[in-house]
């Protein structure tokens, strides 16, 4: 029996023994015993069954949550509540190489304001929509601290674009999407001058302003078109969240506000919170974006700060802007799926206010106004626009819609509960306590024209006693609630430990079609072929325009070139292309002391540029575990002192190899090839071409065999010369490629066996 077969049998025997032990352990305790030992009830077990997703299983929905101070977006599955990914948006993130490779640095640079910003405060994500339905193509997320919007491509879950407001100094109210993704709404938060000039607070009423921006989105290019975007100048009220009209109210946008008192605290005066909540009502802003877009297209809107600005005077003259009283200090404005009603809640109230779009539109058409504000904007009387007021609990915030007609859910901050109610009849249907102090809430596809219902997630601000203590800074608590029946049922608590999520959106998982690899040599940030694409065997080092360009490749388990030599003071630009085609075979790249960390997914080309300003030896390596010999995936950047002259001589290796060593390695290679041939026979005897995953594995395995063939020729060439040192080393490299080929083949074979592949007739 040869050594390869012995090793294979040893592994198989170990797996069988492990299986028998685990089976015995599984049967050792009954469900009743487990429940008793852990103090679980039947209700607990039912909740667990509703959220449990077996190994290899998939969630029905994916949630995309803002990451707050992290500057990221968090992706998790529902109902499993398993975190799947953090998408870097406004903050550098080394695992994804975001803000570390040249390509993503350019994306971050797009969001540069007066200086470099390495932080974002993400709040409100929104999907692109087609006819009011989530289409799963792109996601938008805002940065409150630095008024910006990021565009995330859901084909690869990467940030592609960042745009910044030329007017605002903060923007809490973004992002909100119109029903066909024509525009992304983003409102100012804290009133400030629209210029970057200093303006004293004594001129607050005259020179400080708010606003709401409609960012034009090009659905074909997947990018915001800043040249076709426009902003409404608004009074210095603190604008908050927005929503776009649907169906009956299509073409209109709704933006609420607080501190319409225009109060400024500090310097001996009572705090902002006292003066900003003195009145009984604030203002809902109603904007006609469809007509505004027509004016912009007709050249009737002037540019300020390089962007179209519709002044309050022009908006009033053209009938684009109206105000309606709303409960004071509101936090959320939510349009019903059919566009007929708008629900707003005030944080200091116990009621949710339901507005009728039909009544609002009638008032606009008949010019039925109660008066104007201090800036000349028409005000529609509350009693004219209101449909109902419903008592839902103390501190209502946000509302989400169910699949059932007229049914909604409102988060109640002070009472720490969710209220289910009927907004048509004005009747409370159910309430459930959460833990603790809920902010936003999310139903499945709850912002679309056809919400799914089924589940609700309460995005709680405080966790307190829900989880194991981890110090003074607690995680956030997202609680999953079953809303499929008449009564709400709490299912699961999920800690979120990086940043404070604000809003989340959830989409059917089958609407998402993410890729698993890029075209070879791909710049993922521009979605185009990289000019630094490198193919196997074409690696090179080129000095051009004062820069040392390294055109390299990575593949299990080596980086080419493995030695890079430059002179002290030279600028180095390393461009690496991942040659892998197999799914999930990502490589990383880090260099000692150079702040370099790349994430190079299959097919991607990523670059790192830095100045080698200090002579020395700088090891580099792959940071992503990729194969058995991952640790050997290494190299050296040698930075020679200026004027250095190499010494004569050659390196001596620590191990000498003989013909016997070479023959032994060749025997192993022959045995390994026999295993590969049997796996290939299995794959080709089945309908493997019907499985894209297997096709990719086969392509990658074929590439590996090609590399193996080249290594074999080199080994045989050295053996003919009697150089068994190099012959043995290249024969060993031949075997490394074979092992990777076998690994890919066995993965393909397993996939076929587990996914119903059938034999094909010859």
PLM-predicted stretches and their roles:
Residues 12-20:
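Bacterial N-terminal signal peptides
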Residues 2-12:
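Bacterial N-terminal signal peptides that target proteins for export
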Residues 600-655:
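Extracellular/periplasmic metallocenter environments
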Residues 26-541, 571, 609:
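Predominantly soluble domains enriched in secretory-pathway, periplasmic, or organellar proteins
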Residues 541-571:
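N-terminal edge beta-strand
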Residues 161, 575-605, 628-635:
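Histidine- and aromatic-enriched segments that form or immediately flank copper-ligand environments
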Residues 75, 561-583, 604-614, 618-619, ...:
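Beta-strand cores of secreted/periplasmic/IMS beta-sandwich domains, seen most often
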Residues 655-709, 760:
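Amphipathic, heptad-repeat alpha-helical segments
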